[in-house]
Protein backbone atom coordinates (compact mmCIF):
# COMPACT_ATOMS: atom_id res chain seq x y z
CA UNK A 1 0.00 0.00 0.00
CA UNK A 2 1.10 3.54 -0.76
CA UNK A 3 0.13 6.77 0.97
CA UNK A 4 -0.73 10.13 -0.53
CA UNK A 5 -1.88 13.64 0.28
CA UNK A 6 -4.69 15.32 -1.68
CA UNK A 7 -5.07 19.09 -1.42
CA UNK A 8 -8.27 21.03 -1.97
CA UNK A 9 -9.57 24.45 -1.06
CA UNK A 10 -12.50 23.86 1.28
CA UNK A 11 -14.54 26.60 -0.41
CA UNK A 12 -14.24 24.64 -3.69
CA UNK A 13 -14.38 21.03 -2.46
CA UNK A 14 -14.18 20.22 1.24
CA UNK A 15 -13.83 16.94 3.09
CA UNK A 16 -17.46 17.35 4.18
CA UNK A 17 -18.45 17.46 0.49
CA UNK A 18 -16.50 14.26 -0.16
CA UNK A 19 -18.21 12.54 2.77
CA UNK A 20 -21.58 13.43 1.21
CA UNK A 21 -20.60 11.37 -1.88
CA UNK A 22 -20.76 8.20 0.24
CA UNK A 23 -19.05 4.88 -0.53
CA UNK A 24 -19.05 5.56 -4.28
CA UNK A 25 -16.80 8.58 -3.76
CA UNK A 26 -15.99 10.88 -6.63
CA UNK A 27 -13.27 11.60 -9.14
CA UNK A 28 -10.38 13.80 -8.01
CA UNK A 29 -10.58 15.97 -11.10
CA UNK A 30 -9.23 19.28 -12.31
CA UNK A 31 -5.56 18.51 -11.68
CA UNK A 32 -3.40 20.19 -14.32
CA UNK A 33 0.11 19.46 -13.12
CA UNK A 34 2.16 16.66 -14.68
CA UNK A 35 3.82 15.57 -11.44
CA UNK A 36 0.46 15.38 -9.64
CA UNK A 37 -1.03 13.48 -12.60
CA UNK A 38 1.86 11.03 -12.56
CA UNK A 39 1.33 10.51 -8.83
CA UNK A 40 -2.30 9.60 -9.54
CA UNK A 41 -1.20 7.18 -12.27
CA UNK A 42 0.92 5.39 -9.64
CA UNK A 43 -2.00 4.88 -7.27
CA UNK A 44 -3.62 1.53 -6.60
CA UNK A 45 -7.10 0.75 -5.33
CA UNK A 46 -6.95 0.66 -1.54
CA UNK A 47 -4.16 3.23 -1.21
CA UNK A 48 -4.88 5.74 1.54
CA UNK A 49 -4.38 9.48 1.56
CA UNK A 50 -4.71 12.55 3.69
CA UNK A 51 -7.31 15.14 2.72
CA UNK A 52 -5.64 18.52 3.24
CA UNK A 53 -7.55 21.81 3.27
CA UNK A 54 -5.41 24.37 1.44
CA UNK A 55 -5.65 28.18 1.49
CA UNK A 56 -8.26 28.09 4.30
CA UNK A 57 -7.53 26.04 7.39
CA UNK A 58 -4.21 24.62 6.18
CA UNK A 59 -4.69 21.32 7.97
CA UNK A 60 -5.08 17.57 7.47
CA UNK A 61 -8.79 17.00 8.11
CA UNK A 62 -9.53 13.52 6.80
CA UNK A 63 -8.45 10.15 5.44
CA UNK A 64 -9.43 9.06 1.93
CA UNK A 65 -9.15 5.79 0.04
CA UNK A 66 -8.41 5.40 -3.66
CA UNK A 67 -11.42 3.52 -5.06
CA UNK A 68 -10.83 3.93 -8.79
CA UNK A 69 -7.63 3.77 -10.84
CA UNK A 70 -6.41 6.63 -13.03
CA UNK A 71 -8.76 7.38 -15.92
CA UNK A 72 -9.60 10.29 -18.21
CA UNK A 73 -10.58 13.47 -16.35
CA UNK A 74 -14.10 14.25 -17.54
CA UNK A 75 -13.65 17.98 -16.88
CA UNK A 76 -11.49 18.33 -20.00
CA UNK A 77 -11.33 17.06 -23.57
CA UNK A 78 -7.52 16.96 -23.38
CA UNK A 79 -6.47 13.28 -23.18
CA UNK A 80 -3.31 14.15 -21.22
CA UNK A 81 -5.22 14.72 -18.00
CA UNK A 82 -6.34 11.90 -15.76
CA UNK A 83 -7.81 11.51 -12.30
CA UNK A 84 -8.50 8.81 -9.73
CA UNK A 85 -11.64 8.15 -7.73
CA UNK A 86 -11.51 8.64 -3.97
CA UNK A 87 -13.91 8.18 -1.08
CA UNK A 88 -13.90 9.47 2.48
CA UNK A 89 -12.80 6.98 5.14
CA UNK A 90 -12.81 9.03 8.34
CA UNK A 91 -12.24 12.41 9.92
CA UNK A 92 -8.97 13.23 11.63
CA UNK A 93 -9.94 13.93 15.29
CA UNK A 94 -7.33 16.67 15.88
CA UNK A 95 -6.36 18.03 12.43
CA UNK A 96 -2.62 18.80 12.33
CA UNK A 97 -1.95 22.24 10.89
CA UNK A 98 0.72 23.06 8.33
CA UNK A 99 2.64 24.98 11.01
CA UNK A 100 2.59 21.93 13.32
CA UNK A 101 3.73 19.67 10.48
CA UNK A 102 6.56 22.06 9.57
CA UNK A 103 7.65 22.24 13.23
CA UNK A 104 7.90 18.45 13.52
CA UNK A 105 11.48 17.36 12.82
CA UNK A 106 10.29 13.88 11.79
CA UNK A 107 8.43 15.49 8.88
CA UNK A 108 11.21 17.78 7.61
CA UNK A 109 11.48 15.87 4.32
CA UNK A 110 7.74 15.62 3.69
CA UNK A 111 6.69 16.94 0.28
CA UNK A 112 4.06 19.16 1.94
CA UNK A 113 6.84 20.93 3.83
CA UNK A 114 9.18 21.31 0.84
CA UNK A 115 6.83 21.61 -2.16
CA UNK A 116 3.57 22.77 -0.67
CA UNK A 117 2.08 23.79 -4.04
CA UNK A 118 1.87 20.24 -5.42
CA UNK A 119 -1.81 19.21 -5.22
CA UNK A 120 -1.33 15.42 -5.13
CA UNK A 121 1.74 14.23 -3.22
CA UNK A 122 3.34 11.00 -2.03
CA UNK A 123 3.65 10.40 1.71
CA UNK A 124 6.13 7.89 3.16
CA UNK A 125 4.93 5.22 5.63
CA UNK A 126 6.84 6.93 8.47
CA UNK A 127 5.32 10.32 7.59
CA UNK A 128 1.88 8.69 7.44
CA UNK A 129 2.26 7.25 10.94
CA UNK A 130 3.57 10.52 12.37
CA UNK A 131 0.82 12.71 10.90
CA UNK A 132 -1.78 10.16 12.05
CA UNK A 133 -0.26 10.26 15.54
CA UNK A 134 -0.38 14.06 15.54
CA UNK A 135 -4.01 13.93 14.47
CA UNK A 136 -5.06 11.48 17.17
CA UNK A 137 -5.27 8.40 14.93
CA UNK A 138 -3.39 5.75 16.88
CA UNK A 139 -2.85 3.18 15.57
CA UNK A 140 -2.68 4.66 12.09
CA UNK A 141 -5.19 3.24 9.60
Locate the predicted segments by residue.
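Compositionally biased, charged N-terminal/linker segments
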Residues: 1-43, 138-141
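A generic structural signal for short beta-strands and their flanking turns/coil linkers
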Residues: 2, 24-27, 45-47, 60-62, ...
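Short coil-to-beta transition motif at edge beta-strands of beta-rich domains
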Residues: 40-52
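Short, charged beta-turn/beta-strand-edge "cap" motif at the junction between a beta-strand
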Residues: 52-58
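Aromatic- and Lys/Arg-enriched surface recognition patch
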Residues: 61-121
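Charged phosphate-binding loop/patch that engages nucleotide di/tri-phosphates or the phosphate backbone
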Residues: 123-141
Amino acid sequence: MNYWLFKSEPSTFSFEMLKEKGKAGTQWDGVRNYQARNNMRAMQIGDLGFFYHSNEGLDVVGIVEVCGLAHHDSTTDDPRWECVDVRAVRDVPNPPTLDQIKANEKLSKMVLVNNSRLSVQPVTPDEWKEVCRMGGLVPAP
